[in-house]
């Protein structure tokens, strides 16, 4: 398992998405009418409870607060409520977001167990929570507000048809395209490149850690310890390099 290189930036990105989602859901209404306050409240509540329940899942599974679950939780709540944000009560939004957070956290654990890479947690957040959000329309939506004259069971069947048809089109269409591309240009890097990091292996962009590793490797091969490790008081690797130079 590779740890994220910058958790604070990832968390900031999630907060920016959260803020932007108010405009996304509110703007999708198409008019500045009485639905807007309900949409904004439901969006906020679902994201908040997605954060709470996903974080709780991280604590239960890993026995400690896990940043990944805290970052994906509110996003899962946002995805879950998007389809029904204008047609459910705030109490329903809490339930939808809570279940979305649990589904997202469970999917993260499942993907790690079956060893499927998903570096941006798109499957837990957008696929799993998106499916749940689509189903939630039939379970919690106010059909009178929606103008739907179906039973909940009938609407649930319609939602499932939509999930299956759109999901099949996207999966098989993407699979065929990527399979063809992969035949000419392999999409996955090798194990060494993956461990080294794509910034270095593909873009030749060095990092403090990589520079420190290069010095240590060179010293081990040449047994010449006159080469100094990079020093920087503002990075972990630079601080280690400073102390290493003192030691040597």
Locate predicted features.
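Hydrophobic alpha-helical transmembrane bundles of multi-pass membrane proteins
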Residues: 1-219, 227-233, 237-247
